[in-house]
Amino acid sequence: MPRSLSGRNFLKLLDFSTEEIQYLLELAADFKRLKRTGTPHKYLAGKNIVLLFEKTSTRTRCSFEVAGNDLGMGVTYLDPGSSQMGKKESLEDTAKVLGRMFDGIEYRGFDQKIVEDLGRYAGVPVWNGLTTEFHPTQMLADVLTIQEHFGYYKGLTLTFMGDARNNVANSLMVVCAKLGINFVACGPKDNMPEDKLVATCRKIAKENGCTITLTADVKKGTKNADVIYTDIWVSMGEPAELWEKRIKLLSPYQVNAAVMNNAKPGAIFLHCLPSFHDLETTIGREIYEKFGLKEMEVTDEVFRSPQSKVFDEAENRMHTIKAVMYATLK
């Protein structure tokens, strides 16, 4: 049993020990059982939290709101237009005000420095719902999903395909190193995690008996994978010229049947969502009209296959976020 996490911020997994991460995963599994059996668990009744969103979201917002309500807390949501942080009021002042009114603060937005500063000034636990650099709550959901499917995670190999510079790849590399999971970043050689973070993770991985591998070779990168993971290539609001460049660069790293067949028998597919695997989204249709692509980072065949565990993974956001809030607020 690790030392108490009460009062701690949850900003990045580098701040947590292997034992602390394992504790959060065990707690999440317990909360999932309570939810599935309909057992009330309003353990934090009387507390209030605020969700500070500078970037919109479906899964993160819903996970925090449902988890907060399940725990008996009041939940306030501030959308990108509802907060004066950084506009009429400094980040420090906003953090101090919110910290006087709420028992915990979730932030989803841009630079990691913003959430770190919130954590420095608020005086209450601050949770990172996503920044440009890291996405720690997603990682707990990912590993819980892997644990549920295989029965264990230590010694497995996870391959991330695509732009490995992003927050998801960064966070996957960290959590894999912490938990003894071999991590492979498979993508263009100029789209790899920063050298400093790679060096840090390799040191942690060595202590936990696993490896960090960077490769541009799809066959080598996916050969021994138990888990194939990817993320979207483009985002709404980015210029079309950037879309074309990124699609051309990342197309060789699409997750398709050939990739899954090259992985280990029984390999699973994970994706943090949303995904552009068909034409049922505005961006998907726009990409099709401009570039003739019906599928992007993953084919519809793989996305809908029995190997795909993306909806288990999405549900697990709620259970793992509940664990983080309970552990830091109890």
Which residues fall in each region the model found?
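Anion-binding alpha/beta catalytic cores of soluble intermediary-metabolism enzymes, centered on
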Residues: 96, 103-175, 271
